[in-house]
């Protein structure tokens, strides 16, 4: 059973290995502090707790997973957030990614399609004191227009194409970080919305995520 400290070392090691693709050999200090502050074992089922600090995805029920810690840290880093930001997360899952983001920004709105997971995550986040996170059960493809525009959006499930509603809900020069692709593996992308509503797309590296589900699904 690995420790929290070993997980953090593993994240830095992975960053060094993938620096060719991510463009730097280490992740932002603030991101690493957030990863250090959030107890991953609180966000996994009891039977998975011995593996909570492995640098690997873990099943959380309902056919969903909690992402590999390195990928959580990398996507958080790529969002390039500031303390005053309001962020949207699509795909709450266990609430772990939202908890990490909450350490770095003013407010996190997070959407989960599966009601059971949303309720569990909401209760967990409240119990652990993450008061700046708000959870909604909805189809994340369509975002959260009532709270838009956002300073950044993160999608933690793979979409076959870039969801236009999410682009529409970004502020100018804000980023959308998401895995893109209908099959596996997918590509982790950073999509930046420009002042003229055009987008700049940057490929980071290959990843493997569960698919984004909801009414928008392509048969």
Swiss-Prot record:
The primary site where this protein sits is cytoplasm
| Presence of the UniProt keyword Ribosomal protein in the record | no
So where's the catalytic machinery, residue-wise?
Answer: 67
Enzyme Commission number(s) from the entry: 2.1.1.77
Q: Which SUPFAM superfamilies match?
A: S-adenosyl-L-methionine-dependent methyltransferases
| Keyword field | Cytoplasm, Methyltransferase, S-adenosyl-L-methionine, Transferase
Which Cys residues form disulphide pairs?
A: none
Record's function text = Catalyzes the methyl esterification of L-isoaspartyl residues in peptides and proteins that result from spontaneous decomposition of normal L-aspartyl and L-asparaginyl residues. It plays a role in the repair and/or degradation of damaged proteins.
Task: Report the NCBIfam families cross-referenced here.
Answer: pimt, PRK00312.1
- List the protein's name: Protein-L-isoaspartate O-methyltransferase 2
Which organism does this record belong to? Answer: Nitrosococcus oceani (strain ATCC 19707 / BCRC 17464 / JCM 30415 / NCIMB 11848 / C-107)
